[in-house]
Amino acid sequence: MDLELFDDDQLLDDKHHDLIKKLVAFCGKQLKLPENTEMSITLVGDDEIERINREYRETDRVTDVISFAIEEGEDDLPLLPGMAKNIGDLFIDPLTVRRHAEEYGHSFERELGYTVVHGFLHLNGYDHIKPEDEAVMIPLQKKILAAYGLTR
């Protein structure tokens, strides 16, 4: 996985940046994605995630993660051999992640991992709106977290 990680406001330390990078690489292997698959994660604060949520999701509140998948359509040009596929962008609010960790009674690292995996799966076409989709996504999410060693 080719991950671009942006943390302009230094919301996380190097240890947590490393966790994100390793977990994204692990997720890519779990889903058997080509090694040159690209994505980005931008770490933002409460005000910015609320603005993005309001502007693009029409929901005026903070959240932990917002995903913008780059979905293939009929009009897309096919990728040339060896050309990287960009699956999209995640915006993660570590402040909300920390609040969730405290609320749910587990470590910040586990909640950060959960948030990264959850967003990663959304970028790869998984969803949980319909019960039948949730029945696929949530067990896969739990399986990846357990295999990585981030359990409740």
From Swiss-Prot:
Top-level taxonomic group: Bacteria
Cofactor: Zn(2+)
CC annotations in GO: cytoplasm
Gene3D superfamilies given in the database record: Metalloproteases ('zincins'), catalytic domain
Binding residues for Zn(2+): 118, 122, 128
Record-level Gene Ontology MF annotations: metalloendopeptidase activity; RNA endonuclease activity; zinc ion binding
Name this protein carries in UniProt: Endoribonuclease YbeY
Keywords assigned by UniProt, alphabetized: Cytoplasm, Endonuclease, Hydrolase, Metal-binding, Nuclease, Ribosome biogenesis, rRNA processing, Zinc
Main location (coarse class): cytoplasm
Assigned EC number: 3.1.-.-
Cofactor descriptive note: Binds 1 zinc ion.
GO terms classed as biological process: rRNA processing
Enzyme class: hydrolase
Subcellular location: Cytoplasm
Similarity comment text for this entry: Belongs to the endoribonuclease YbeY family.
Pfam families: YbeY
Record's function text: Single strand-specific metallo-endoribonuclease involved in late-stage 70S ribosome quality control and in maturation of the 3' terminus of the 16S rRNA.
SUPFAM superfamilies: Metalloproteases ('zincins'), catalytic domain
